[in-house]
From Swiss-Prot:
Protein name, UniProt field: Somatostatin-2
Subcellular location: Secreted
Keyword annotations: Hormone, Secreted
Family in the record: Belongs to the somatostatin family.
Entry keyword Secreted: yes
GO molecular function: hormone activity
Length: 57
């Protein structure tokens, strides 16, 4: 889905950027994943019934 595409591009940018594997501490990969997943899931959980979310997973 869209969230996976965004996450993959973010990870590729972090790994393949000018700094190579040097990732700024304020933008660690776990934090990026947490922020992206929360940004994607929070509105879905609030707006859609649990059954719809189960189908998406």
């Amino acid at each position: 889905g869209r969230s996976h595409m965004v996450l993959n591009s973010a990870l590729e940018g972090a790994r393949g950027g000018p700094g190579g594997e040097e990732i700024p501490e304020r933008f660690s990969i776990p934090e990026l994943q947490w922020m992206l997943s929360n940004a994607e899931l929070a509105p879905v959980q609030a707006d859609e019934p649990p059954q719809s979310r189960m189908d998406l997973v």
